[in-house]
């Protein structure tokens, strides 16, 4: 892909998703030091410098402290950004060495938490991320293999909103190779992560399957179009299930939610699954994706079959039928 097409990709993204960019004063971009995020940061800086000079670009690098070279890589990003107009670099630090288990997930959560806090403090509403077509491909097949439901299979949208912050991904139709070539042409030195070639990681194994599947017609463009349809159908189902949730809600307390069970049994399986998931989310104090779809479906099927639903737990909540089958209760464990 030519440089002009990549520049057009970023410009088109602003036109489509940030049409009021004249009112925007600051944007941020997450940069690890790899080719993907550095290419995106450079493209954004070019856009800001040429067309949106009123916008300041905040380049954010999180130093997890998990690898000896992490600090050097963060400083390397700063040395590159120091020569750019309209751009500043910030290193956000998190000490991951104190985490004994689930280090990768905790590091990912910490990364987003630190960047979100920075954006809140500086009034930034748009955080750009360097996810590309290859990342989308890997994410889809990882989630498919794990049995994800429609929400999970929708993968990454060009823009998603979390706690008022717009997460922007303009490169979902581009390849890693496109971005490496861009860095080479612009003489941008990037850092290589050895784990990107290590077969012990699930993502790497799926990445190597792309060559075969792309030869059968599964391009990044075709995959993203399919995922867009999945997200549209999911949103419609989400709106409908929320309407039914409110209609069938009998009582909501701090630690318990009661529903009209007779009316619940008249709903489709997918809708009831969504009601169950929302109840868990509203009672849960923990972050995360919640119970696996398969487990939620098993509970929901048993509830709808009406053959003596047994009290059970799921997602740290207790599910039981009360008052001779008239009410369905979800309470904190």
Regions found by a protein language model. Give the residues of each.
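Core alpha/beta nucleotide-donor-binding catalytic domains of modification enzymes
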Residues: 2-209
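Residue-level detector of well-ordered alpha-helical segments, enriched
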Residues: 136, 205, 222, 271-275
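Internal, active-site/partner-interface "lid" segment
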Residues: 196-203, 221-232
């Amino acid at each position: 892909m030519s440089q002009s097409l990549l520049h057009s990709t970023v410009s088109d993204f602003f036109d489509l998703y940030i049409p009021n960019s004249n009112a925007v004063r600051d944007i941020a971009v997450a940069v690890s030091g790899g080719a993907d995020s550095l290419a995106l940061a450079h493209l954004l800086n070019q856009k800001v410098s040429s067309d949106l000079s009123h916008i300041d670009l905040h380049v954010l690098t999180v130093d997890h402290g998990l690898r000896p070279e992490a600090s050097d890589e963060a400083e390397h990003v700063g040395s590159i950004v120091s020569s750019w107009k309209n751009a500043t670099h910030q290193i956000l630090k998190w000490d991951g060495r104190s985490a004994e288990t689930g280090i990768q997930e905790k590091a990912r959560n910490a990364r987003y938490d630190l960047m979100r806090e920075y954006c809140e403090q500086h009034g930034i509403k748009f955080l750009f991320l360097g996810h590309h077509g290859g990342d989308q491909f890997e994410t889809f097949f990882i989630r498919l293999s794990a049995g994800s439901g429609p929400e999970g299979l929708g993968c990454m949208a060009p823009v998603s909103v979390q706690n008022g912050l717009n997460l922007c991904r303009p490169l979902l139709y581009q390849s890693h190779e496109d971005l490496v070539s861009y860095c080479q042409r612009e003489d941008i030195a990037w850092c290589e992560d050895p784990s990107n070639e290590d077969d012990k990681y699930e993502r790497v194994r799926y990445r190597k399957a792309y060559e075969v599947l792309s030869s059968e017609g599964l391009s990044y463009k075709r995959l993203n179009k399919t995922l867009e349809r999945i997200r549209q159908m999911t949103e419609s189902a989400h709106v409908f299930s929320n309407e039914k949730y409110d209609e069938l809600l009998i009582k909501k307390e701090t630690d318990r939610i009661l529903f009209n069970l007779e009316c619940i049994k008249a709903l489709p399986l997918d809708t009831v699954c969504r009601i169950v998931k929302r109840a868990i989310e509203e009672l849960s104090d923990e972050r995360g994706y919640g119970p696996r779809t398969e487990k939620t479906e098993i509970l929901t099927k048993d509830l709808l079959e009406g053959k003596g639903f047994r009290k059970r737990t799921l997602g740290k909540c207790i599910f039981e039928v009360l008052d001779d089958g008239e009410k369905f209760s979800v309470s904190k464990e």
